[in-house]
């Protein structure tokens, strides 16, 4: 696996024309912008975990049937400090950078003290977020980095803490029809409490539609949920939204804050301070978007680890939400670089297969309902919600599919009933070998695969004016374990899952994580969404935080990114 994981990737600073085979639809005009780890060693020092690698941005610009590729390392403070020192000097989640051995005892003592409450990295390697007219590389810390989506130049550094009190934040925000951003973060021991903070960033600065105004300055707290534990908050990678509610899972995959505070002096990584508590429950929080308060009923399910929400919607008095769930945290453990050897593809095995699970949460619980009765009256799912003696509700999911990750949908259906999921098929190994189209209605699937090929997260781009949910194309950056085979951008017909075209490039491409598609200038997001009602037209601040036309609870500025992801 040296070709994929063990070798630093080279930048392609100038646009490189790809060799296109097949026919690219004439309407497909824009830039696929992706993010992921590309550098795993600096000098003689090595990162411990694949998710620690320095961020490498890359893009495929599609114009009139031609494709141009470029890539560039994110010029973060972390990157610059490491390169200048020729070693890793900034800690990542799985790699603790140690003090200079030449420092005297007083300098070392000060370093230990300064790391008690760590200033996290700005190595934003996970996703791309659109905020107003700007694009940002994101990670799961309080920092994001503004970038130029065309040149891939790194611009200013933004600290969420200047606007909202969060130490950590997700890389999978949601968007409403106006382009407002909804995201979540964790505020650690703020004013004596640890809480999960939902915050909203307006699409434009209030009172001005002029370009250049920073909407981040006008961020507001949408809702706060106290952590069940002051010193052991839940780790979460994403969340879900419907037209009227927000879905947040407080799962028993936890951060031990005391251990994190002493990690530096103990010489261990922050990742070692994460614990999966298999005896604990997963608590389901449903937040009303209108009142901005959680539904008072206590919902829970069995212990699980969820990285990616797929979608959520309301039906017959219930919130239905779909997630990719694991029985444990083995996925994260497998990607330590020590495990990514030549036998990784054959020998790496998850101890729990990622499953697509559908939960149904009743919005109104009959106090007179019998204990043990199923409160779900939705005919479209076998998921149950059982009333218990203490008025808690135990939710059991319907398992829809086994062996998939990195889910995307047509974001025009985010927060609404939907039918299709586009994902990478992974089964018991974390290696993505196929692209999957899954129909949640018929439970049928279509797949694309090719020998020695590893596909990245598949991104759906709808045909302009499309009426069918799957009328569009799938874009996926494909790398190969065969050094003789060039990497390429794959373009599939989303309906039939047949190949329309591929654009091969003779570059050292990395396996990326998440990203978005930016249509060419002139595209109007509002025109690509269903017509607004009169009530919507009269509201300057719509409460429905769904985003037809945008990304996967993430960010796909296609004419039409699926539900959110990693």
UniProtKB/Swiss-Prot annotation:
Pathway assignment: Cofactor metabolism; retinol metabolism
Signal peptide: none
Alphabetically ordered keywords of this record: Cytoplasm, Dioxygenase, Iron, Lipid metabolism, Metal-binding, Oxidoreductase
One GO biological process term: retinal metabolic process
Keyword Iron attributed: yes
Reaction(s) this enzyme catalyzes, per UniProt: all-trans-beta-carotene + O2 = 2 all-trans-retinal
Coiled-coil residues: none
Annotated localization: Cytoplasm, Cytosol
UniProt-annotated binding residues for Fe cation: 172, 237, 308, 514
Pfam family, one: RPE65
Gene Ontology CC entries for this record: cytosol
Molecular function as annotated in GO: beta-carotene 15,15'-dioxygenase activity; carotenoid dioxygenase activity; metal ion binding
PANTHER family cross-referenced by the UniProt entry: BETA,BETA-CAROTENE 15,15'-DIOXYGENASE (PTHR10543:SF132), BETA-CAROTENE DIOXYGENASE (PTHR10543)
Protein task: Symmetrically cleaves beta-carotene into two molecules of retinal using a dioxygenase mechanism.
Name under which the protein is recorded: Beta,beta-carotene 15,15'-dioxygenase
């Amino acid at each position: 696996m040296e070709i994929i994981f063990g070798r630093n990737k080279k930048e392609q600073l100038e646009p490189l024309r790809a060799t296109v085979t097949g026919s690219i639809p004439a309407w497909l005009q824009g830039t696929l912008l992706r993010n992921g780890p590309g550098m795993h060693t600096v000098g003689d020092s090595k990162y411990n975990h694949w998710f620690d690698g320095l961020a490498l941005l890359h893009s495929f610009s599609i114009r009139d049937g031609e494709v141009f590729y470029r890539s560039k390392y994110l010029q973060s403070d972390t990157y610059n400090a490491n390169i200048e020192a020729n070693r890793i000097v900034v800690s990542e989640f799985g790699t603790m950078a140690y003090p200079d051995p030449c420092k005297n005892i007083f300098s070392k003592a000060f370093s230990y003290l300064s790391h008690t409450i760590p200033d996290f990295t700005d190595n934003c390697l996970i996703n791309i977020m659109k905020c107003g007219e700007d694009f940002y590389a994101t990670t799961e810390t309080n920092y994001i980095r503004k970038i130029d989506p065309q040149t891939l130049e790194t611009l200013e550094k933004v600290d969420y803490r200047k606007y909202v009190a969060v130490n950590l934040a997700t890389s999978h925000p949601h968007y409403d029809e106006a382009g407002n951003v909804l995201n979540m973060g964790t505020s650690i021991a703020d004013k004596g409490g640890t809480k999960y903070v939902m915050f909203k960033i307006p699409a434009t600065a209030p009172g001005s539609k002029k370009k250049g105004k920073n909407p981040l300055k006008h961020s507001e707290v949408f809702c706060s949920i106290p952590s069940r534990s002051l010193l052991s908050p839940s780790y979460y990678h994403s969340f879900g939204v419907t037209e009227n509610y927000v879905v947040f899972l407080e799962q028993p995959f936890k951060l031990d804050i005391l251990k994190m505070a002493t990690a530096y002096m103990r010489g261990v990584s922050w990742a070692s301070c994460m614990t999966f508590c298999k005896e604990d429950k997963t608590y389901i929080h449903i937040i009303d978007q209108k009142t901005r308060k959680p539904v008072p009923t206590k919902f829970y399910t069995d212990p699980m680890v969820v990285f990616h929400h797929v979608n959520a919607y309301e039906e017959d008095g219930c919130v239905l939400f779909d997630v990719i769930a694991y029985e444990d945290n083995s996925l994260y453990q497998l990607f330590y670089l020590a495990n990514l050897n030549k036998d990784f593809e054959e020998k790496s095995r998850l101890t729990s297969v990622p499953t697509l699970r559908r939960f149904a949460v009743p919005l109104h619980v009959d106090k007179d309902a019998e204990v043990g009765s199923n409160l779900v009256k939705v005919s479209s799912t076998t998921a149950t919600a059982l009333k218990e003696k203490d008025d808690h509700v135990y939710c059991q999911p319907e398992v829809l599919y086994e062996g998939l990750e990195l889910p995307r949908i047509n974001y025009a259906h985010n927060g609404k009933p939907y039918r299709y999921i586009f994902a990478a098929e992974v089964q018991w190994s974390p290696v993505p070998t196929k692209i999957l189209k899954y129909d949640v209605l018929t439970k049928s699937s279509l797949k694309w695969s090719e020998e020695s090929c590893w596909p990245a997260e598949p991104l759906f781009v709808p045909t302009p004016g499309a009426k069918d949910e799957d009328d569009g194309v799938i874009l996926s950056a494909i790398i190969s374990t065969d050094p003789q085979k060039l990497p390429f951008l794959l373009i599939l017909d989303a309906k039939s899952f047949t190949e329309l075209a591929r654009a091969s490039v003779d570059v050292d491409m990395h396996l990326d994580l998440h990203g978005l598609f930016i249509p060419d200038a002139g595209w109007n997001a509002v025109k690509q969404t269903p017509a607004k009602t009169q009530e919507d037209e009269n509201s300057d601040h719509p409460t429905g935080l769904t985003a037809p036309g945008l990304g996967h609870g993430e960010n796909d500025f296609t004419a039409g990114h699926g539900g959110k992801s990693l």
